[in-house]
Amino acid sequence: MFAKQIDIHWQKMKGIKFLHWLLGTVLLWVSLSTPALAIPALDYNPWEAIQLPTTATILDMSFIDRHHGWLVGVNATLMETRDGGQTWEPRTLVLDHSDYRFNSVSFQGNEGWIVGEPPIMLHTTDGGQSWSQIPLDPKLPGSPRLIKALGNGSAEMITNVGAIYRTKDSGKNWQALVQEAIGVMRNLNRSPSGEYVAVSSRGSFYSTWEPGQTAWEPHNRTTSRRLHNMGFTPDGRLWMIVNGGKIAFSDPDNSENWGELLSPLRRNSVGFLDLAYRTPNEVWLAGGAGALLCSQDGGQTWQQDVDVKKVPSNFYKILFFSPDQGFILGQKGILLRYVTDLTAAPA
């Protein structure tokens, strides 16, 4: 009888242990499968969605003044606005074919430039009423990736392999600013003062260049995650976006030192594509699947603009031409326009 009671007690103990194990397993599974708590929602939406009269992807935009601007994109897409970007009208150029990818457009006053690939360069001095094609050297390293209008016939061009050139005579002659290219780039950004930062095609390293240097300076990435995009903060630091939905900012005193990786969305399922400052403290971060976040403290804490999640587009590029004029470029002819009378954000 005593042995039977021990056996019954032992069976009960095993049953309790099994229940504890089962409960622990269920709790672990729930904790791993439940997404992290969402970040706070932005209590206003300053962005208006615009569907352009095209399904082409838009790659760049530039304004002559607050009202008159131009945008460019794939399939030789060229459009003009005269109402600050509320409406856009297609413009057609007589080219040898329509497969050009217009990568970049830039205006300084009425003088403007467009570059793209296969290698092509267009120039206007009358605000875009007429465009002339500038011949490019067949030996040009790579294809034009970015153009910056500097005014009075001057411009700076960089190719997709990092060759930098400057003209002072409306494109008749070009001076090389670096001795050699750096290879194919994934992303490229220029600071207002003329510095460049470029991410390598594989995201394994980045390179920087400052006016006066004759060569790019390579830098190893400081994280095991691959780099996606990099750019400049208003105070001259660098920011980076890496795979997995994380960002980081360089140290104010040493650009080689970086702060910790931040996860603005608190999960790794969204890839961010671009970052831009509206003011010295207000930062916008855009990415895939309609992801759009805003920080009011320079990128330390974030809120999500949930109203734009219904827009069926990835957001590739953020452009602010002033604190109250900005655009976000999407896919299939979709834009977001910053509308000041919709926002309660601080200036």
Curated annotation (Swiss-Prot):
A motif (Arg-rich patch) lies at residues 202-226. Disulfide bonds: none annotated. InterPro entries: PSII_CF48-like_dom, WD40/YVTN_repeat-like_dom_sf, Ycf48/Hcf136. Keywords: Photosynthesis, Photosystem II, Signal, Thylakoid. It is found in: Cellular thylakoid lumen. Its main location: other. GO terms for cellular component: photosystem II; plasma membrane-derived thylakoid lumen. Residues 1-38 form the signal peptide. CDD domains: Sialidase_non-viral. The keyword Endoplasmic reticulum does not apply. A factor required for optimal assembly of photosystem II (PSII), acting in the early stages of PSII assembly. Also plays a role in replacement of photodamaged D1 (psbA). Assists YidC in synthesis of chlorophyll-binding proteins. A 7-bladed beta-propeller torus, about 54 by 46 Angstroms, with a depth of about 25 Angstroms and a central pore. Belongs to the Ycf48 family. This is Photosystem II assembly protein Ycf48. It comes from Thermosynechococcus vestitus (strain NIES-2133 / IAM M-273 / BP-1). The lineage of its organism: Bacteria, Bacillati, Cyanobacteriota, Cyanophyceae, Acaryochloridales. The gene is ycf48.
